[in-house]
Amino acid sequence: TFNLSIVEEFFNVVTSNDVKPVDGTVDLEAGRTERLKLFEESLLYTTEREFFDEHFCRYPVIRINFKEVSASSLGTFYKKLAASLHSTLDRWLRQLEGADLDTRAKASHQRVVEYHDSMELHLEKTAQHWELQESDAENIFVRLSNLLHDVYMSQYVVLFDEYDKPLKAIRGQPWEKAAAEMYTSLVNKIFKDNNDLKCGLLVGVYKLPLVDIGSGANCVHFLPLTVHGYHSGLNDDRGQPAVLHNSLVDMFAHDGTEVRLLVEAARGRYRRISYYSTEVIMTTLTKWYDGYAFGGTGGKFNPYAVAMFLRELEHGNVNFATQDYWQDTEN
């Protein structure tokens, strides 16, 4: 999810909500300059400059998260999918508040606002699946797609978090086939023959056969978090043990070098943290938070836990600094 946020910051256009008005004027270029600070020392900026300049802040980003999708009934499944996409639509409407739109875009925006408000009431009242059409989730996406096209006249990027959650939720249910067909239709709508789509990134815990379920998303490239030569215990599409590459192993969590940099920066900035030597802090952090392993590679630190530890240390809460922070989250 954190990595998706970085991808979103890179591709997403700057909106009026990203910039503080000065004398009633919104300077979007100033917002772009401010966002550039996030990437100025990145490898992408320093080694892939042509790509960077071509795509930075260029496309509206549609970010979808199906974390809340559950399946106690077919009706619940329809509603949760629609509600998740409605939240995505809601975020974009808020981003476009105060935007300087031309006549066509303004009319499109008003139509979508009215649709958004009516759908919000509909979702609040819906209790049974026959009150919510299975096409409602698709309709919400289409409305958002059309709006972004009218406003920006460009393609968009789709970031799809927990794409596997809906199919896992319906597995073994008596209405699994109907739900799978509905979800397949939605994936079709987003990824197949969509001329407004620049590219998409789907993230999930389990590799699911999107192509096999007939989604039409035939140009899918899998990027597994597995070290080359490491047998994950999973089988590939031919039933053979999966031996996969490691292109993303170093892209998640922190290693010891990165944590040491954070500790040294914190010691230089916060007086209470400076009471403790770098080695003392590193020993504690290593004992508590370096237990993560990706693709058979261990020694990874939990970024959230490290940040929370340093925050507690900054406030002088030495006795409470070491906790299992991650277990209290939903992730």
Regions found by a protein language model. Name each.
Residues 165-168, 192, 208:
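Residues immediately C-terminal
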Residues 152-177:
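Conserved P-loop NTPase "ATPase switch" module shared by AAA+ and STAND
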Residues 89, 140-151, 177-198:
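Substrate-engagement module of ASCE P-loop NTPases
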Residues 63-76, 80-138, 166-173:
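Conserved P-loop NTPase mechanochemical-coupling segment
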Residues 3-98:
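P-loop NTPase motor core
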Residues 6-10, 78-81, 172-178, 207-234, ...:
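Short secondary-structure boundary/capping segments
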Residues 210-217, 223-309:
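Amphipathic alpha-helical segments of the small helical/lid subdomains adjacent to P-loop NTPase cores
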Residues 157-161, 181, 185, 198-205:
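Structural recognition of the conserved hydrophobic beta-strand(s) that form the central parallel beta-sheet
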